[in-house]
Structures are given as C-alpha cells and as structure tokens.
Amino acid sequence: MTATIAFAEEAPQNADSIVKTLLAATESGNFAEFQQQGDAAFQAGITKDMFSKVSQQLAPALKGGYDLSFLTSLTQQGYDVYLWKITPNTGKDQFVAKLVLKNGEASGFWIQ
C-alpha cells in the first residue's frame, strides 16, 4: 500500500468569494445578500426566520473578527464541496464552514 502526501491547497476564487460574502451577510444579518449567493433551491430552503436565528447566534463571534482557513475540497454526487475552519478572535469555540456549489452557485451552506 502506498500513500500520497498532499500539500495545502487553496480554495478556488469563486468559492472563497462566496463563503466570505455568506459569512459577512450572516454577521450583519443581511438576508438579501445571503440569498443572492445561492441557486433557487438554496433560496427556497432558507427562510428569513431561519437565517435570523442563525445570524443572531453567530454574529457575536464573527463581529469580533475571525481567521478563515481553507481546509479542503471534495466532490460529492456531482457537487463541489469546500470546507473552512473559522477561528473567532474571541478565543472561544471554532467552527467549520461547509459550502456546496453547483454551476458556480451555492447549493448549501452550513456552519457547525
């Protein structure tokens, strides 16, 4: 059995731009900006109330500033999946952001 050593990769510019916009919209509570990043299914699947609850929960950690570190990319069922580590400057919990793209638009976005 052989192993291949992989070196750090960078997120594609489009994915990087979308995740930063989604995080900024989450931080500021800007639902319209958040929705603009996604395809029709993404937009239909996230209500303003759902977004507001998540924004209220995460905004305090994001507003203090954070470091966004790209982790890796995957291909799953024809979708491009990208993962980042979010380290808030508050020194509290870290998060993982998962962005799923199809044809250059967000099809899914999760922060865990």
Model-predicted segments: where are they?
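Short charge-dense sequence patches
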Residues: 3-9, 46-49, 95, 106-107
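Short, low-complexity N-terminal intrinsically disordered segments enriched in polar/charged residues
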Residues: 3-28
